[in-house]
């Protein structure tokens, strides 16, 4: 088998018995790295320490990942302009933070007869956020509410910014 030492140096091709003896003398483990290679490749290492460092690396990678959440903002067909602007600002903030936004438009009572008003509100939201978001799920009616899902647009990579 081909043997790799503690510091990653090549120890060459050795017999299995010699490799086991070396690992016992050094008080480390003999770990098979590439069983399908010809000859198989083994390495002398402290396996417990290796597993610990591997777990630390995986935990660090997990902590760097951003969990995308779906934030919901509720509208009504007759939402006033001031309220509309506040809700739109919240949607902007959610999208800029990288979260998806679920825009829900709730119909009450006889408002169900005028679904086109609700559709207009959702289209207005879409048009106001066109530079920040793309529509992931087109508006659709679910019971007494119309739902649309917006996802943040991918930022263009390598685009020179205005500052310089």
Curated annotation (Swiss-Prot):
Which Pfam family, giving just one, matches this sequence? IF3_C
Q: Where in the cell is it found?
A: Cytoplasm
User: What InterPro entries does this protein map onto?
Assistant: T_IF-3_C_sf, T_IF-3_N_sf, Translation_initiation_fac3_CS, Translation_initiation_fac_3, Translation_initiation_fac_3_C, Translation_initiation_fac_3_N
Name the keywords, alphabetized.
Cytoplasm, Initiation factor, Protein biosynthesis
A biological process (GO) of this protein is: ribosome disassembly
Q: Pull one GO CC term from this UniProt entry.
A: cytosol
Q: What is a single molecular function from GO for this protein?
A: translation initiation factor activity
How does this chain assemble? Monomer.
Q: Which family does it belong to?
A: Belongs to the IF-3 family.
Free-text function comment from the UniProt entry: IF-3 binds to the 30S ribosomal subunit and shifts the equilibrium between 70S ribosomes and their 50S and 30S subunits in favor of the free subunits, thus enhancing the availability of 30S subunits on which protein synthesis initiation begins.
This chain belongs to which protein, by name? Translation initiation factor IF-3
Originating species: Bordetella pertussis (strain Tohama I / ATCC BAA-589 / NCTC 13251)
């Amino acid at each position: 088998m081909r043997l790799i030492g503690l510091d990653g140096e090549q120890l060459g091709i050795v017999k299995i018995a010699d490799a086991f003896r070396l690992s016992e003398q050094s008080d480390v483990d003999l770990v098979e790295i590439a069983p399908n290679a010809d000859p198989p490749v083994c390495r002398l290492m402290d396996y417990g320490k290796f597993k610990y460092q591997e777990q630390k690396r995986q935990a660090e990678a997990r902590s760097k990942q951003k969990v995308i959440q779906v934030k919901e903002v509720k509208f009504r067909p007759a939402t006033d302009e001031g309220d509309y602007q506040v809700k739109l600002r919240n949607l902007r903030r959610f999208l800029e933070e990288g979260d998806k936004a679920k825009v829900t438009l709730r119909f009450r009572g006889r408002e169900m007869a005028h679904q086109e008003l609700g559709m207009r509100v959702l289209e207005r939201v879409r048009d106001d956020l066109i530079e920040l978001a793309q529509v992931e799920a087109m508006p659709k009616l679910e019971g007494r509410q119309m739902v649309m899902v917006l996802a943040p647009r991918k930022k263009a990579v390598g685009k020179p910014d205005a500052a310089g």
